[in-house]
Regions:
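Flexible beta->alpha loop and helix N-cap segments adjacent to enzyme active/binding sites
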Residues: 14-243
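Single conserved hydrophobic/aromatic residue that forms the stacking wall/gate
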Residues: 1-16, 20
Length: 243
């Protein structure tokens, strides 16, 4: 019997993922493998432990990607979240690296604080880019991390701490080891209008209904191409109105 602290969310056993085609890896193999997958501009559903209780996904029920990619913001919006392509995403950054990327010198573990992107990673707009209008101007690359940089050079930051979020911290650390970047895109594990996923079956359903490339449930890695085909039923996309 699995016991949980009072007022906690459920914790699911590994048996919950037994019905899916997946590869089981220990942390020493899983973290670098997922980091490599992310560095190749794949989108990953990340399901770990108990779900968050609050307004933001914090690395337990998250969809994650590479913030250095110029196309990742559009891809994650249009193909996963099913919303406007210009909607910005938030960064998860190692607490020890936060000042390397943002004008911010403290913790923000709940993704509630907004700060400017550091001058050292900003990309100045050219005179031609300044003349652009509307969506064309919104799509201008503004920093070395374009997928998490808002039009005003701000970002809503989540700092990730090894003591309180060890597995997510280990993943970002592995990504940094491979790429030199201690930041990931982090958005909630759901599509537009739906609640955040709770159970493994919720995560799998969202994974199969969207164009996510990989799903990680605890130590199990699932590739979309390995899964049984799902009969397409796009009526679910019409159940929720645009935000």
């Amino acid at each position: 019997m699995i016991r949980r602290p009072p007022r906690s969310t459920p914790l699911y056993s590994s048996a919950a993922s037994d019905v899916y085609k997946r590869q089981e890896l220990d942390d020493t193999l899983l973290m670098p493998k997922v980091a490599e997958i992310l560095s190749q501009e794949n989108v990953v559903g990340w399901f770990q432990g108990r779900m968050e209780f609050g307004p933001r996904a914090l690395g337990a029920r998250s969809i994650i990607g590479d913030p250095r990619s110029k196309k990742m913001q559009s891809v994650m919006n249009l193909k996963i979240k099913y919303r406007e392509s210009f909607r910005p995403f938030a960064p998860s950054v190692l607490i020890e690296d936060v000042q390397n990327y943002f004008e911010f010198d403290r913790g923000s573990p709940y993704m509630l604080m907004v700060a400017p992107v550091s001058d050292q990673i900003r990309t100045p707009m050219t005179s031609d880019e300044e003349e652009l209008f509307g969506i064309d101007k919104l799509n201008v690359v503004r920093s070395k991390l374009p997928s998490i940089t808002h039009v005003d050079y701000s970002a809503r930051i989540q700092t990730v701490h090894s003591q309180t979020n060890p597995r997510y911290h280990a993943l970002i650390s592995s990504f940094k080891e491979q790429t030199g970047c201690g930041v990931l895109i982090n958005t909630s594990f759901n599509v537009r209008g739906e609640p955040i996923v709770c159970a493994p079956e919720d995560a799998y359903r969202c994974f199969m209904r969207t164009e996510m490339d990989y799903l990680v449930i605890e130590n199990f890695l699932l590739h979309k191409s390995d899964q049984a085909k799902v009969v397409s039923d796009e009526s679910w996309m019409n159940e929720f109105e645009l935000d």
